[in-house]
Amino acid sequence: MYHDNTTEHFLKLGLQSSLKNIGIYRKIVDKIQHIDTYNLKCNDYEWKFKCYNRTRFEKIRNLFRIDLNSYIQSLCDQNMITGKIYPKSGSKFWRTYDNKYIVKTITKKECKFLRSILKRYSNHIKDNTYLVKIFGIYRITLSNFDSRFIIMNNIFQYEINIENIFDLKGTTEERYANEQSIELKDINF
């Protein structure tokens, strides 16, 4: 796997190309899911960046009054802050320098599921929702590296006093953490 800084670099270049609708090559691969594919080149690397259902996510960002330029600025202008890696799921998290957004790696299965519910999700989500706000699904493919990402709102973007953090999964199986743990689980809740 590539170093975090390299992954972040390719993610930023792909985001800039797809969000600004530029790139060496763009085509809609699937008319139902609307996958925009960009063949990009950076130094000696040739790689693909996929943006899933661009127009639907544009509508979601517009619903939450997210200006495209400020979105790109948050994600691309400065280095992201590397977060935690969750060993069980293998997910890696970053947050933007301004704390507005979280970037999370997702599995192929999670990507497929999110894409399958995207139409219903976008029709259901409202301005005052308690659902996580997903603003984009992306994929980087580079020789032997393949990773998928979602970008979502950071619910902790403002300084607040948090007494407990829970990792809730909606099940009780293996879902108890020692009270001294940093993250508590479903049974602790």
Give the location of each predicted region.
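Polybasic, positively charged surfaces/segments
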Residues: M1-F189
